[in-house]
Amino acid sequence: MQHQMKKIRLLFAAFVATLLATSCTQYNFEDTGLANGKHEKSMWDYFGEDSYNWDSLRVMAKRADLIPLFQGNSAYGKDFTFFGPTNHTIRRYLKKNSLEKVSDIPINDCKTFILNGVLRKHMMLDDFKRGTKSTDVSTPIGKGGEMFTMASGRQLWIYSFQEPYNNVPGTGPVQIYLVSPTTTRTSHVGSCNIETQTGVVHALDYYFNLNDF
């Protein structure tokens, strides 16, 4: 009887451990309404099919003559990563700057805002090095991670970090963070690993501002 009870306890412990592991790793993104996954289409067409999140970005791309970028017909090819600002971010920028519509944003600004988010290599969530945020008030750059030069020439320190789950460190979802040495602001990816035929998209969360990079 004692042996049987011990076996039951072991089976229960294994079940709980499996359940916890599944709960921790099922999602690596916030619920921003963007589904991560693989899409058999160009990044440009993917944006076009989700007007709720991306139609403002498409207007910016047209103004900046960057449609070929998202179609895979530019110097960046079909193997790049894009940290994309959603409509919420762009609408907030318009309101803050007293602009009525996206086409009122200066062309050069549209180009800079987009290229600030373009990384010239294909990088999924697991490709970003683990890191920890800075605890030094004199610098926004923490430990680990990696410094990248974006297509605009702007530098960003990017790292991944596994969040706690039920107050247990290192057991929750893995998130991507981006830190600008220029603005000292930290940004966060809301939905990651959106793969298209012309690159991978990591959607920035709704709190991101276009000037954060």
Annotated model-derived regions:
Residues 8, 24-213:
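Mature, structured domains of secreted/extracytosolic soluble proteins
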Residues 1-24:
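Sec-dependent bacterial lipoprotein signal peptides
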